[in-house]
C-alpha cells in the first residue's frame, strides 16, 4: 500500500506478501482461493497503516492471453499549420487501436514517439505547429474474460480496482531508472508460472511478451531429478538456489549443447 505525494511520487506505507493460490500461468482457476490470497495480502499490508482502507487498487496482470504489437497512425491537423492540441492527440491515439476480436480488450496504448510534418524524435507534440501528426504506439491487449475475472475477484474483498497494469511494466517502474530506459534495457521477471519481459528503447516500452514458463517448472524438474516431493523441492530451491553470472566468452560449446545464443 502506498500514498501519492504532492509531486506524484509514491510513498510505500506497507506491504503484504503471501503464497499465491488459485492462479495458473496468469489465469484464475479457483476464484475462492484467489480471493483468499488477495484478502490475506491486503490484511497483512493494512497492519502497517492501522484501520485505514485503500481508496483504490492498481493490479498487475500477466498470462499468455496477453499480446502486444506496435502500430502507426497519422492524422491531419484541421487547423492546417495551427497548434497541435490534446484533442487532436487523443484522436490520433484512438486511431492507433488495432482491430480486436470479440473477446479481446485493449489494456494499454503507449506512445513510443511522434512525428510532426516528417520531423522525428518528438516526445510530446502538444503546442507545436504542424499539419500532419504521426504516432508509433505500443499496444497491449488481453482476453476480456480473464481481465474481467481479475477485477471481479479483487472487488469481492470490498476493494475498488482503479486500473489493471501489465505486470512487466509495473516491474520496470519499480526497478528501472530513467537513464536505463533511455539507454535501452530488458526487464525479465521470472514468476511462478510465467516469465514477463519488456524491452525499453529511448525511454519507452518497445516490446513486451509473456512466456508460459516460470519457477514452478524449475521446481518440477528438480523434483524429478532429485526424487523429492514438490514442497521439499521448493524449500531446497529457495534456500540453496543461486544464479551465478558467467561471461559468455567463458562458456564452452558442450556446456550449452551447441545452442549458443
Regions found by a protein language model. Give the residues of each.
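Extended, hydrophobic alpha-helical segments in both membrane/secreted and soluble proteins
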Residues: 183, 193-197, 218
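Short, glycine/acidic-enriched loop or turn micro-motifs at the edges of active sites
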Residues: 192, 255
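Short beta-strand scaffold segments in enzyme catalytic cores
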Residues: 1-2, 196-199
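Nucleotide/phosphate-binding catalytic cleft detector across ATP-hydrolyzing
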Residues: 3-187, 204-206, 215, 226-252, ...
Amino acid at each position: 500500500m502506498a500514498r501519492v505525494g504532492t509531486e506524484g511520487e509514491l510513498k510505500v506505507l506497507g506491504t503484504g506478501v503471501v503464497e499465491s493460490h488459485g492462479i495458473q500461468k496468469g489465469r484464475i482457476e479457483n476464484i475462492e482461493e484467489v480471493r483468499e490470497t488477495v484478502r490475506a495480502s491486503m490484511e497483512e499490508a493494512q497492519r502497517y497503516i492501522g484501520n485505514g482502507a485503500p481508496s483504490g487498487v492498481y493490479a498487475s496482470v500477466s498470462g499468455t492471453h496477453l499480446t502486444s504489437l506496435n502500430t502507426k497512425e497519422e492524422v491531419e491537423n484541421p487547423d492546417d499549420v495551427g497548434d497541435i492540441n490534446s484533442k487532436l492527440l487523443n484522436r490520433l491515439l484512438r486511431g492507433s487501436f488495432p482491430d480486436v476480436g470479440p473477446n479481446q480488450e485493449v489494456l494499454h496504448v503507449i506512445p513510443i514517439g511522434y512525428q510532426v510534418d516528417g520531423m522525428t524524435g518528438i516526445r510530446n507534440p502538444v503546442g507545436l505547429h504542424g499539419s500532419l501528426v504521426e504516432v508509433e504506439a505500443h499496444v497491449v491487449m488481453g482476453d476480456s474474460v480473464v481481465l474481467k475475472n481479475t477485477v471481479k475477484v479483487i472487488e469481492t474483498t470490498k476493494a475498488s480496482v482503479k486500473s489493471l497494469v501489465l505486470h512487466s511494466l509495473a516491474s520496470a517502474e519499480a526497478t528501472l531508472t530513467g537513464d536505463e530506459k533511455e539507454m535501452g534495457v530488458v526487464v525479465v521477471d521470472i514468476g511462478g508460472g510465467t516469465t514477463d519481459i519488456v524491452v525499453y528503447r529511448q525511454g519507452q516500452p518497445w516490446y513486451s511478451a509473456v512466456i508460459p514458463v516460470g519457477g514452478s517448472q524449475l521446481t518440477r524438474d528438480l523434483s524429478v531429478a532429485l526424487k523429492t516431493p514438490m514442497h521439499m523441492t521448493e524449500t531446497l530451491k529457495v534456500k540453496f538456489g543461486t544464479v551465478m553470472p558467467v561471461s559468455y566468452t567463458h562458456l564452452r560449446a558442450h556446456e550449452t549443447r551447441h545452442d549458443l545464443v
